[in-house]
Every structure is written in structure tokens, then in C-alpha cells.
From Swiss-Prot:
Protein name: Leucine-rich repeat-containing protein 4B
Classification lineage: Eukaryota, Metazoa, Chordata, Craniata, Vertebrata
Membrane topology: Single-pass membrane protein
Biased composition (Low complexity): 528-544
Keyword field: Cell membrane, Cell projection, Disulfide bond, Glycoprotein, Immunoglobulin domain, Leucine-rich repeat, Membrane, Phosphoprotein, Repeat, Signal, Synapse, Transmembrane, Transmembrane helix
Originating species: Rattus norvegicus (Rat)
Length: 709
């Protein structure tokens, strides 16, 4: 009986009536198996009598398989290489605890359905480029507890569905820029226990926009790396490091973070506003550190914070922790003993912080060490109003002229509160003019100090000029306004602008000055300036203005003399450029003239050597036409002068310049040769005194000149 052969595509089969039971089983297996695709690593099913590749359910000898070979476990088999006969329908492959050292290119290329690959606890020191090619379904890749010294960035190509990557406990020394940008689909990244890690690039985590969990615990970190790119991060593990200080901005951009673990991190100080960026934080673990106190209202911006672990810290219970006791009572009223115990002073040692109240301490309101001062600036400049205290355990807020309360983290377009309490203006406008109040708060109360910010409008005429000043000076600030960015100083002068009216002398009562509007700005002082009152326990100093006017200049070296020097340089440059253009023009004219003269000289030199002169003796009565048409000279017969009516025939005119002398001599001999004695002809003596006319004819083809002598 013929047998049915099924391999990738249907072949002619026997009629159902003649088909045996094994053949029917093979047919059903083919119908319900995945179709073969070109290059896809399909399964070839053959009957017992036919040849072909191993069946799909075959399992490597060193491994154990289950669930129809979809789970292959090859742990603790001392494998030095990845087995080559892993079934193509494998979804879970465990190769842990072997001796594999190198993962070679295309090792798993045929495992298109593989979802979980475990290679941890091997001796892997090298992963070749393309080692994970052909794994479009891979979801989890475990490489922890190996010997990798670098992040195998190139090997992660084409892992479009990778969600989890485990690199924990490898001797990795550095994490370069864009180390994981080839796997933007990552949700969990474990980089814990990298005990030889020395460097993390600022752009190491760029591209991980979908990351939810990051483990950087026990990596000997001294500073928190840049995590700004992890905009969707929800859980961050930083335990087991050496983070002595937590600074403001350490968690910038982590607005989605819900859980932060900082246990056993040797944290001794947390600065004011350090957690302000963690708007979504729900759980914070600060246990087992070296914390003695926390800044006032550190947790106030964390509106979603529900669980805080503060145990096993040497808390010093004084006025600085009193706010924490109140916060714990409000946040976790049912369990105020969950979190921390006092370590000092001795009278409160062992008491829970949540049980403390104000009766245990004698507290005082904070002191402002550096209060804000009045400031005069020009529109468009930067400005700062400082308000500093002697301790970081206080909170600093600002009240603006329109009643808005500014805190650290409550950013506006141009105004923000820095972590040290400074109110920063990046670009002031006239509308910013007014009184600003600094409020410093601790558990005992608050202290306020006020200062006035005067913003002057820019005079377009003054701003457009080099110095930006009007007559009489004092306008240098206008032109230099564009060069000032951060700090300004107030400069006073007793000089009165021409045409300005003298101001009335001030009274003994100090009042803040009005906006600076002198002649340089093209405007006068307003009739009345808004008074600035200070209701503070530590009042801010007020600057008196005994002078006629005040204006601001930048602290940079942009002065009027510097601007004049710049004008001189520009003028000198223009003069040099003009001279260069004039010299170039004169040189061009001289070159053209020289060229023309040289051309004329060459033309004259060309015609000169080609000219020759022929002297022809012609008769006075000889017509011009006859003289030209004479072809040969007539011979003189007999004696000279015989036949006086006969005419003398001229010799033929030759053009040979080389025989010129010969022809002239012949003509002379023909005329005087008939009288050997040198006498005259038959005409008589009168004929001898009359010379025959001579014709000078130039040999040049261009010019012909005739002269009678």
C-alpha cells in the first residue's frame, strides 16, 4: 500500500476508503499544525517509511521538555554551548547554571515563538552581534550573574517585543550613552549589584520612554544619575548605595514615579525641595540611613504620599522634627508609631516621633540671614531677589504684588523660586513692578521680609543708540541692557539732566524709590511711588535715595568708553576698506593704460622693419600714369644727348629688397654713363644744371609714400 507523504505542502493522498489508521492520523496532524513558511523554520512531519528532519516534539538529550516541547529546561547540565536541537515551537527556554561563555550569532534564530530566555548564572563574557536575531516574540531576557563587562547594546537589535532585561550582578564598569535605545519597548530594567560600576553617562537611559521599573541598587553610586528621560518610570530602587546627600533636582522629570526605595543608602542630608518633582509619589522608604532631621514641609508637595518608612535613623528630636510629627498625625493618624523613634536627646530617646508635640520643646521663629533688597532694573533684564536663612530646615515662599503665593516647583513663565529660596526673574517686564514678600517658616512660626522691584521701560531711542544714553550721560545702561543676564547693581549720581526740574528734598522718613525713569529713558518720575511696608520679625533693610536720580547698569564691562572704542574700531575698519577699494581701482586703470600703450608700441614696431626705399629718376614732364606703367629702361645709343626729343625710359621697378643697391646704381649709370668725361648731353650746358626728379617709394604693402626731391 502506498503511503501518504506530508512535508510542508499537501501531496496526493489515497482515497479515504483505502487509507490506513496511521495515515489518517498523519493527515489530521498536518491539518492542525502551523503551515510552513519559507525560511520560517517550519516542522516537517514524515511517516515511518519516509526520511526527513527530527519530529517537532523531539527534545535535546541534555534537557527536559514539557507541554509538547514548548518548555525546555536545560539547567545544571554543565553545557558549554547552547544546544542546537531545541524544538522550534519552544516558548520557554531555561539555560541557567551552566558553563556557557559565548553567545554566538544566530544561536536562537529558529526559535521564532520563544518568549522567555534564561541565561543567568553562567560564565557568559561575550555576546556577539546578532546573537538574539530571529526572536521577534522574546519578552524576557535574563543575563544576571554572569561575567559581562559591558552592556551588549548591539545584541539587542530587533528585539521589538522585549519587556524585561536583567543584567544584575555583572562586572559591568560603565553604562555608555544610548545603551538601551535599541529596545524602547523595555518595561523593567534590572541593573542592581553592579559593584564595579564607575560611570553612568548623562544619556545612558535615553530612549527608554516606556520603562516602568529601574533597579540601580547596590551599585556604589555616590550621586543619583540623570533620569530625566524616564518620563513613565513608576518604581525606582536606589537602596544599598552611598548617597550621602540628596539634592534638589535629583528626581527631575520623574512625575510618574509612585515608589522610591532608598534603604541602606547612607543618606545623611536631604535638602529643601529635594522631592518636589515627585508629584505622584505614593510610597517612600528612607529606613536604615543616617538622617537626624528633615527640612520643614519636605513632604507637603507630595499630595499622594501615603506610606513613609523612617525607622532605623538617628533622629534628633527638636523643633526641626516637630513638623514631621504633625504631618504623621495627619497622614497616618491610625498608626503614629510605625515610622521612627527619637535617638536624641536622652530625655526623648526611644519616643516615637508621631507622639511628640510642641510642649516638649521651646522653639523660635526663623531668622532671615540675607533679606531681599530693593532693586531697580530695566525691562528685559534678569533679576534676583534673595532670601536666605541660616538653616535648610525651613521653607521659603514668596508673595507677589498680585497676591500669588510662589513656592519652589510652582513655576511660571518667567518667575520661579530656586531651591535656596531666591526669587528668580529670567526676563522682567513693567508689570512685574511692585512689592515682593519673602516668608520663611518653621515649626515655631514664620518671618517675612519685603523688597520693591522697580522695572523701567526701555526708551526706543536710547536703546537704539550705541550708549543708549541721553544728554548729560547717565544712559549707558540702556545700550548695555542686552548684555546683562543675571545680576545688576544700582548706581547713583548727583548730576541733573538738562531741562529736568529739581526734585524736592526727601523727608526723614525712608521710603522705597519709585521706578527709575530719568532722561536716559525719556520719561519723568511718577507723581507718587507705591510704598513698600515690611511686617517681619527680621525686617529687610531699605535703601535710601539721597540723590537726584538713579539708574541701573550691568556689572559687566560694557561701559560708554567701551562703546566709543567700538565705534572707533568700526570707523577705522571702514577707512581701511575704502583705501583698499581705491587702490584696487587705480591699479586696474593703470593696468588698462599700460596694456593700450604696449599694443600701440608693438604695432609700430611691426611696421617699421618692413619698409624699404627705392629712388627712381623720372622725367619732370612724365605723367603720373606713364610713370607707373613704365616696364623697362631704354638704352642710350651713341653719344649722350643725341636726339634731344627722345625721352629717357626708366628701368623696371623691382621689389627685391636685397638687390636694392644694385638697381639704384644701374639707374645712375644709365643716366650719366654716356658721357665719360662727365660732360652733359647734346642739349647743352643748361641741361646739366637741372636734376631729374627722384621718386621715393616705400616697400611696405600697407603704406605708400612718394616724395619728390
Amino acid at each position: 500500500m502506498a503511503q501518504a507523504h506530508i512535508q510542508g505542502s499537501p501531496c496526493p493522498l489515497l482515497p479515504p476508503g483505502r487509507m490506513s489508521w496511521p495515515q489518517g492520523a498523519l493527515l489530521l496532524l498536518w491539518l492542525f499544525s502551523p503551515p510552513l513558511r519559507a525560511g520560517g523554520g517550519g516542522v516537517a512531519v514524515t511517516s515511518a517509511a519516509g526520511g526527513g528532519s527530527p519530529p517537532a516534539t523531539s527534545c535535546p538529550a541534555a534537557c527536559s521538555c514539557s507541554n509538547q516541547a514548548s518548555r525546555v529546561i536545560c539547567t545544571r547540565r554543565e553545557l558549554a554551548e547552547v544546544p542546537a536541537s531545541i524544538p522550534v515551537n519552544t516558548r520557554y527556554l531555561n539555560l541557567q547554571e551552566n558553563s556557557i561563555q559565548v553567545i554566538r550569532t544566530d544561536t536562537f534564530k529558529h526559535l521564532r515563538h520563544l518568549e522567555i530566555l534564561q541565561l543567568s548564572k553562567n560564565l557568559v563574557r561575550k555576546i556577539e552581534v546578532g546573537a538574539f536575531n530571529g526572536l521577534p516574540s522574546l519578552n524576557t531576557l535574563e543575563l544576571f550573574d554572569n561575567r559581562l563587562t559591558t552592556v551588549p547594546t548591539q545584541a539587542f537589535e530587533y528585539l521589538s517585543k522585549l519587556r524585561e532585561l536583567w543584567l544584575r550582578n555583572n562586572p559591568i564598569e560603565s553604562i555608555p550613552s544610548y545603551a538601551f535605545n535599541r529596545v524602547p519597548s523595555l518595561r523593567r530594567l534590572d541593573l542592581g549589584e553592579l559593584k564595579r560600576l564607575e560611570y553612568i553617562s548623562e544619556a545612558a537611559f535615553e530612549g527608554l520612554v516606556n520603562l516602568r521599573y529601574l533597579n540601580l541598587g547596590m551599585c556604589n553610586l555616590k550621586d543619583i544619575p540623570n533620569l530625566t528621560a524616564l518620563v513613565r518610570l513608576e518604581e525606582l530602587e536606589l537602596s544599598g548605595n552611598r548617597l550621602d546627600l540628596i539634592r534638589p533636582g535629583s528626581f527631575q522629570g520623574l512625575t510618574s514615579l509612585r515608589k522610591l526605595w532608598l534603604m541602606h543608602a547612607q543618606v545623611a542630608t536631604i535638602e529643601r525641595n529635594a522631592f518636589d518633582d515627585l508629584k505622584s509619589l505614593e510610597e517612600l522608604n528612607l529606613s536604615h540611613n543616617n538622617l537626624m532631621s528633615l527640612p520643614h514641609d519636605l513632604f507637603t508637595p507630595l499630595h499622594r504620599l501615603e506610606r513613609v518608612h523612617l525607622n532605623h535613623n538617628p533622629w534628633h528630636c527638636n523643633c526641626d522634627v516637630l513638623w514631621l510629627s504633625w504631618w504623621l498625625k495627619e497622614t497616618v493618624p491610625s498608626n503614629t508609631t510605625c515610622c521612627a523613634r527619637c535617638h536624641a536627646p536622652a530625655g526623648l530617646k526611644g519616643r516615637y516621633i508621631g507622639e511628640l508635640d510642641q510642649s516638649h520643646f521651646t522653639c523660635y521663629a526663623p531668622v532671615i540671614v540675607e533679606p531681599p533688597t530693593d532693586l531697580n532694573v530695566t525691562e528685559g533684564m534678569a533679576a534676583e531677589l534673595k532670601c536666605r536663612t541660616g538653616t535648610s530646615m525651613t521653607s521659603v515662599n514668596w508673595l507677589t504684588p498680585n497676591g500669588t503665593l510662589m513656592t519652589h516647583g510652582s513655576y511660571r513663565v518667567r518667575i520661579s523660586v530656586l531651591h535656596d529660596g531666591t526669587l528668580n526673574f529670567t526676563n522682567v517686564t513693567v508689570q512685574d513692578t511692585g512689592q515682593y514678600t519673602c516668608m520663611v517658616t518653621n515649626s515655631a512660626g514664620n518671618t517675612t521680609a519685603s523688597a520693591t522691584l522697580n522695572v523701567s521701560a526701555v526708551d526706543p531711542v536710547a536703546a537704539g543708540g550705541p550708549g543708549g544714553g541721553g544728554p548729560g550721560g547717565g544712559g549707558g545702561a540702556g545700550g548695555a541692557g542686552g548684555y546683562t543676564y543675571f545680576t545688576t547693581v544700582t548706581v547713583e549720581t548727583l548730576e541733573t539732566q538738562p531741562g529736568e526740574e529739581a526734585q524736592q528734598p526727601r523727608g526723614t522718613e525712608k521710603e522705597p524709590p519709585g521706578p527709575t525713569t530719568d532722561g536716559a529713558w525719556g520719561g519723568g518720575r511718577p507723581d507718587a511711588a507705591a510704598p513698600a511696608s515690611a511686617s517681619t520679625t527680621a525686617p529687610a533693610p531699605r535703601s535710601s535715595r539721597p540723590t537726584e536720580k538713579a539708574f541701573t547698569v550691568p556689572i559687566t564691562d560694557v561701559t560708554e568708553n567701551a562703546l566709543k572704542d567700538l565705534d572707533d574700531v568700526m570707523k577705522t575698519t571702514k577707512i581701511i576698506i575704502g583705501c583698499f577699494v581705491a587702490i584696487t581701482f587705480m591699479a586696474a586703470v593703470m593696468l588698462v593704460a599700460f596694456y593700450k600703450l604696449r599694443k600701440q608700441h608693438q604695432l609700430h614696431k611691426h611696421h617699421g622693419p618692413t619698409r624699404t626705399v627705392e629712388i627712381i629718376n623720372v622725367e619732370d614732364e612724365l605723367p603720373a600714369a606713364s610713370a607707373v606703367s613704365v616696364a623697362a629702361a631704354a638704352a642710350v645709343a651713341g653719344g649722350a644727348g643725341v636726339g634731344g626729343d627722345s625721352h629717357l625710359a626708366l628701368p623696371a621697378l623691382e621689389r627685391d629688397h636685397l638687390n636694392h643697391h644694385h638697381y639704384v646704381a644701374a639707374a645712375f649709370k644709365a643716366h650719366y654713363g654716356g658721357n665719360p668725361g662727365g660732360g652733359c648731353g647734346a642739349k647743352g650746358p643748361g641741361l646739366n644744371s637741372i636734376h631729374e626728379p627722384l621718386l621715393f617709394k616705400s616697400g611696405s604693402k600697407e603704406n605708400v609714400q612718394e616724395t619728390q626731391i
